[in-house]
């Protein structure tokens, strides 16, 4: 949940600073995995559009890694059907979010795609809260 909140926060900064216009290529920025001058100053992580969009992109990669890990852990624990169904929904919405994010970049921030990306972030946050709530409810009944 912490990763998701940070990611949504950086998404908000990306939109607010119009940082999505910084680089219209993916996965590289300016032809590099690590563009120069990203972290010249600590304040760059809050003020510099290039650094903000870089962090937003890399937190997406972290999500790509974490979702299968969580998926495997939940499947291994044999949670009830509604929790597993919620996990499938969560996985699908994460995949949609990443797809919309990449399409937003490649379309040079087409407003419709960008708005869908933001709306889907709200859906993703709601699903994550619901999913965590269900996990805790199941864990309490097991205890």
Per-region residue spans from a language model:
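Polytopic transmembrane helical bundles with strong interfacial aromatic enrichment
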Residues: 1-143
């Amino acid at each position: 949940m912490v990763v998701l909140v940070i990611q949504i926060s950086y998404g908000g900064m990306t939109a607010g600073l119009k940082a999505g216009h910084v680089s219209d290529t993916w996965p590289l920025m300016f032809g590099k995995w690590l563009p120069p001058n990203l972290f010249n100053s600590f304040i760059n992580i809050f003020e510099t559009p290039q650094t903000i969009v870089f962090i937003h992109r890399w937190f997406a990669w972290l999500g790509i890694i974490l979702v299968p890990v969580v998926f495997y852990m939940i499947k291994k624990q044999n949670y009830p059907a509604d929790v597993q169904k919620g996990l499938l929904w969560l996985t699908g919405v994460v995949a949609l979010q990443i797809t919309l994010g990449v399409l937003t970049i490649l379309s040079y921030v087409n407003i419709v795609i960008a708005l869908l990306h933001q709306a889907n972030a709200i859906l993703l946050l709601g699903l994550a809260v619901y999913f965590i709530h269900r996990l805790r409810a199941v864990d309490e009944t097991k205890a």
